[in-house]
């Protein structure tokens, strides 16, 4: 099997990022559990969303997230064991449920529920 992992240590131009995202089979997203924003503790998946989710939707890719990242999305795969365990996962996901219109409707519902 021809398997390679590509990562960057610094920000890359958008066209290069898009090119690699289009070529990718799966996204590995080893995000940190917690961060801080203006001295406020933020927890990814609860009070803060990872941009990796938007990338997975935009490019129609499966994404491996830390096991403790809460997600109901079928394209988010909880990381268990080693990364190698995920390289052979074949999973069909219908990304049409994440169209701009549907995401906007869900966002509006969430915002109005908070008011």
Regions found by a protein language model. Give the residues of each.
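C-terminal accessory extensions appended to soluble enzyme cores
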Residues: 59, 69, 78-81, 103
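Structural motif corresponding to alpha-helix initiation and N-cap regions
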Residues: 11-15, 50, 101
């Amino acid at each position: 099997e021809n398997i390679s992992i590509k990562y960057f240590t610094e920000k890359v131009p958008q066209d290069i990022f898009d090119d690699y995202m289009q070529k990718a089979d799966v996204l590995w997203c080893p995000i940190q559990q917690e961060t801080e924003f203006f001295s406020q503790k933020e927890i990814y998946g609860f009070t803060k969303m990872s941009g990796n989710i938007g990338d997975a939707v935009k490019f129609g890719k499966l994404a491996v997230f830390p096991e403790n990242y809460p997600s109901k999305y079928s394209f988010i795969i909880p990381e268990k064991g080693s990364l190698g365990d995920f390289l052979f996962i074949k999973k069909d996901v219908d990304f049409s449920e994440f169209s701009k219109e549907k995401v906007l409707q869900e966002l509006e519902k969430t915002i109005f529920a908070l008011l």
